């Protein structure tokens, strides 16, 4: 089903994604394009009902003020100016105002009254459209997907499975740095329930041997990332007839790579680093979706709520939460204490309130008392933060009775631990993760 679209032209505003999300929340599809898109390129886009120019005229590139192609105003498509002073625009929206409701009302009026757009953007339509597109792109060929168990790769797997069934080959690499029960969940959901073609590779010893004695966080990340690519490459070479590589690229990955006007936040990468002789065509069915839409897509596809709303998890896994050189006893302490924290937050209803929460175990011990004797064991540090964009973060003021219950369980149930601390550091100055 072809949905109506509102195009946002980027003139250097930091609010592009906020604007796109606001329009999508109205049930109308929206995408961000560079300011110098041509009329021909705009005409080639499907069902464009309106254009929003977002940003001021004070932005420059190489000393030259930037603006949109003036021919856009003669296309016969309504144009709104958001913080852009053009008399030719149908509607003007102030760039800075405290009246959020007035802005929402103006956007809604432009989308529905001025542009006459139809609210036909929803997950059911998206899933059906993507299934059709995937089948058209892939045909009867096979797709290889690295299935980590995270939200993005899980939703991609479920969507590809709906589209091409047994022609999807998933590879799950258990590097020994997963959260408790995570690999088992992947096998249960995708292999046992959804009957996916799943290759499960347990390389725990291989990874932990490579990481032995490595203290530097960046070096740990490089070892984990590099070894993952090598394992994935080895498994890919064992498989015949693979022409496509599925990836969990989402819309913020594309936007954050930057346009000519917006500063690049980070270079986009996903399952990169494969040798050049493994030439796959990419299948990226989620590249249009924001993170909350990815979760909605997962629910639409029937994935378990717990999998779709899984906590954000760093690529190196628990490897950067077992601080310093990774040892098996401290890694187990991180895994067990993290499981207790997640269970108790779920019981208390905090799992739906707190953006991210986890435990870390540092590479030092403290003196304590256990069974009327001196102990010398590891501390566990709890971290729970709230954020909108992960650029800044505040600390969740967890009630004392909940913290005391979590502490009691960790001290009783986790081996080699005699102390529990709560990290009170906001971002800035501290980052969300410790390493």
Curated annotation (Swiss-Prot):
Keyword Lipid biosynthesis carried by entry: no
Record pathway: Purine metabolism; GMP biosynthesis; GMP from XMP (L-Gln route): step 1/1
Residue ranges annotated for the Glutamine amidotransferase type-1 domain, each copy included: 1-120
One term of GO molecular function: GMP synthase activity
Keywords for this protein: ATP-binding, Glutamine amidotransferase, GMP biosynthesis, Ligase, Nucleotide-binding, Purine biosynthesis
GO biological process, one term: GMP biosynthetic process
Enzyme Commission number(s): 6.3.5.2
Keyword presence, Kinase: no
Top-rank taxon, per record: Bacteria
GO cellular component annotations of the record: cytosol
Sequence ranges assigned to domain GMPS ATP-PPase in this UniProt record: 121-310
Binding site for ATP: 148-154
PANTHER family noted in UniProt: GMP SYNTHASE [GLUTAMINE-HYDROLYZING], GMP SYNTHASE-RELATED
Name listed for the protein in its UniProt record: Putative GMP synthase [glutamine-hydrolyzing] 2
Gene for this chain: guaA2
């Amino acid at each position: 089903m072809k949905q109506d679209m509102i195009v946002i032209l980027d003139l250097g505003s930091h609010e592009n994604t906020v604007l796109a999300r606001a329009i999508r929340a109205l049930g109308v599809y929206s995408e961000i394009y560079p300011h110098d898109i041509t009329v021909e390129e705009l005409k080639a886009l499907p069902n464009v009902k309106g254009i929003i120019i977002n940003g001021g005229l004070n932005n420059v590139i190489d000393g030259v003020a930037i603006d949109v192609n003036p021919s856009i105003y003669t296309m016969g498509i309504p144009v709104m100016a958001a913080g852009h002073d053009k008399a030719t625009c149908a509607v003007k929206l102030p760039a800075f105002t405290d009246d959020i409701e007035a802005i929402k009302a103006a956007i809604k009026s432009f989308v529905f009254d001025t542009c006459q757009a139809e609210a036909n953007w929803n997950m059911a339509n998206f899933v059906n459209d993507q299934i059709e597109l995937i089948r058209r792109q892939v045909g009867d060929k096979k797709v290889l997907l690295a299935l980590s168990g995270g939200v993005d790769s899980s939703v991609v797997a479920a969507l590809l499975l709906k589209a091409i069934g047994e022609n999807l080959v998933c590879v799950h690499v258990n590097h020994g740095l997963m959260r408790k029960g995570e690999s088992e969940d992947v096998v249960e959901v995708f292999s046992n329930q959804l009957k996916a073609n799943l290759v499960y590779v347990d390389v725990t010893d291989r990874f932990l041997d490579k990481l032995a004695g490595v203290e530097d966080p960046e070096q740990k990340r490089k070892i984990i990332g590099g070894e993952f690519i090598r394992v994935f490459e080895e498994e890919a070479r064992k498989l015949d007839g693979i022409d496509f590589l599925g990836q969990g690229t989402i819309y913020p990955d594309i936007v954050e790579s930057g346009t000519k006007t917006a500063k690049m936040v980070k270079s986009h990468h996903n399952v990169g680093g494969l040798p050049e002789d493994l030439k796959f065509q990419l299948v990226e069915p989620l590249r249009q979706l924001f993170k909350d839409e990815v979760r909605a897509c997962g629910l639409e596809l029937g994935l378990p709520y717990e999998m779709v709303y899984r906590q954000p998890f760093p690529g190196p896994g628990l490897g950067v939460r077992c601080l310093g050189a990774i040892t098996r006893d401290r890694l187990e302490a991180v895994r067990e204490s993290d499981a207790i924290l997640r269970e108790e937050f779920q019981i208390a209803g905090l799992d739906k309130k707190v953006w991210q929460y986890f435990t870390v175990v540092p590479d030092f011990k403290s003196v304590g008392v256990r069974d009327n004797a001196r102990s010398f064991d590891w501390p566990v540090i709890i971290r729970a933060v709230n954020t909108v964009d992960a650029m800044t973060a505040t600390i969740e003021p967890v009630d004392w009775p909940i913290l005391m219950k979590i502490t009691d369980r960790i001290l009783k149930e986790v081996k080699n631990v005699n102390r529990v601390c709560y990290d009170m550091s906001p971002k800035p100055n501290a980052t969300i993760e410790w390493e």
